[in-house]
Amino acid sequence: MIRRGRLLTVAAAVGAVVALSATASAAAPQDAEGFGGRHSVREHLSSYHEHPLALSTTGNGQFRATLNERTGEITWQLSYADLSGAITQAHIHFGHAFQAGGISAFLCTNAGNGPVGTQTCPAAPATISGTLRAADVIGPAAQGIAAGEFAEFAKAFRAGVTYANVHTAAFPAGEIRAQLDR
């Protein structure tokens, strides 16, 4: 009888845990793929991550970002140092680790080619930060993300198929890069 009582107690406890898990899952807002809430990355930028050719420079950096799906924003911070030339611009691109993808959003530019309100890139060493919203997403349309399509950009960010890239006068295609997948 005592054994049967313990079995019933364990069964009730397991049932309560399952019920609470189901309730918590139902309470969190989710999109069609089942995502909801926040997603964060923290990456080290290096010239070795550049594509199609890895580079060997002293340039380095850090990129941190948090996607808040409830507010439709990505807050970010980019630090860079020891670049081999003057920084010209920095972006988030849409592409795999060994792919050169199109620009999704500007982080900064000194080339005057960013959307209105894009901050200028200070000389290295520097740390800049900002918030990306739908109005900051510029594409890439050729890869299926239209300008202003924050939900598609957010899906790519969550899936780890975006990367941060810092471009310099010495390396216009990019000097340091990090895949945003951790």
Name the predicted role of every residue range.
Residues 2-9, 17-90, 94-182:
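Metal-centered catalytic cores of metalloenzymes
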